[in-house]
Amino acid sequence: MAQRVCIIGAGVVGLATAYALVREGFDVTLVEARERGGLETSYANGGQLSYRYVAPLADSGVPAQALGWLLRNDAPLRLRPRLDPAQWRWLLGFLAACRGSLNRRNAAHLLRLALLSQRTLQDWREEDGLDGFDWRRNGKLVAFRQPASFARARQGLADPSAQFVLTAAECLALEPALSAAPFVGGIHTPDEEVADCHAFCVQLAERLQASGHCRQLHGRRVTKIVEGGAAVRGVEVGGDLIEADHVVLAAGYRSAELMLPGLRLPLYPLKGYSLTLPVGAQHRAPDTSITDYDRKIVYARIGERLRIAAMVDIVGFDPGLEPARLALLRQQARDTFPQGGDFDAAVEWAGMRPATPTGVPLVGNGGYRNLWLNLGHGALGFTLACGSGRLLAEQIGRRPPSIDTTGLLPRGALAG
């Protein structure tokens, strides 16, 4: 008889975990508070599958920059201090992670997981015929406005054999739509990819339904993880107990509400925003994915749409749209790609990205014998989802992991 796994949360990480587990022979129950999966942080994110450019937000240059950003209305990072111990714990952990040695170590952890994720998605596409989510291998160009930031990036390439330094003229030759922006150079990674994260969630949910080994409960909120000694028995949903041999917590930033006594998740939501523009024959949208490094804006051509995403707001738990931030994003995007799409028809969105202070997700055991975590991916949720799901399925199935798991669930990370 197949072992039963209950997964809390049907965003891209939860769905990818369910898919990996079903492929390994488990029976899965997926519980999602919304009416279907992929409607929260996975709905309209940046769309870039950025496997080799995975540097954590916690960087040695950020503390000094942040002091200047606090005084600017157009800053890519905004902090609104609150009387919230969780926010201050997270900020202190973030500052500690900005040390250069820790940043490099955490970037190495992320790169291992990202490359596994790329291989895993390729396996699923080739072996299972998974498609229908506007996937393309279109490459990525990280473009720089400031000579100093360009110089630092050239010195810290994650994979010099797969990344290429370009002059301003070479950037323009690669992507002619950049003609309106004063970039001084860029770093090109040809094998990066792009896709529609929400459509990917829909495809995974349909495949899981067709498998006969995944029960999906939508519009149902888990109110409690039920413990029993050194293990957990299952989850409580609407007063009913759903028993399981294993429980996976993948509910994004809301996961902290469900942690058991004595355990605390080092998570905080980083609010981000996106615009999605229709692209017609009269427009000049970039075909290559673009990251405007100095403004911290990403651009991704997803089918006949241009997705523009940006900003890190550490402002609490309100997921609502903020007109001033969206107006700033619209203005900066129009300055960079004035003919990039129909700005008047842009669809606005905001999402709450669950992040750890280090930027490295928590993928592994959650302090009880059969409680597992897959969360804290920050802005890299789509990029890391398939690899994280595969890695957790291997751990639950007691199989040798595909990569070294060092750093993915550090000792003491869950201390209450």
Swiss-Prot record:
EC annotation from Swiss-Prot or TrEMBL: 1.4.99.-
Annotated Pfam families: DAO (PF01266)
Record-given protein name: D-amino acid dehydrogenase 2
Family classification: Belongs to the DadA oxidoreductase family.
InterPro entries in UniProt: DadA, FAD-dep_OxRdtase, FAD/NAD-bd_sf
GO BP: D-alanine catabolic process
An annotated GO cellular component: cytoplasm
Catalytic activity field: a D-alpha-amino acid + A + H2O = a 2-oxocarboxylate + AH2 + NH4(+)
Residues at which FAD binds: 5-19
Swiss-Prot/TrEMBL cofactor(s): FAD
PANTHER family: D-AMINO ACID DEHYDROGENASE (PTHR13847:SF280), SARCOSINE DEHYDROGENASE-RELATED (PTHR13847)
Any GO molecular function: D-amino-acid dehydrogenase activity
Keywords of the record: FAD, Flavoprotein, Oxidoreductase
Role played: Oxidative deamination of D-amino acids.
Domain of life: Bacteria
Class of enzymatic activity (EC top level): oxidoreductase
SUPFAM superfamilies, sorted: FAD-linked reductases, C-terminal domain, FAD/NAD(P)-binding domain
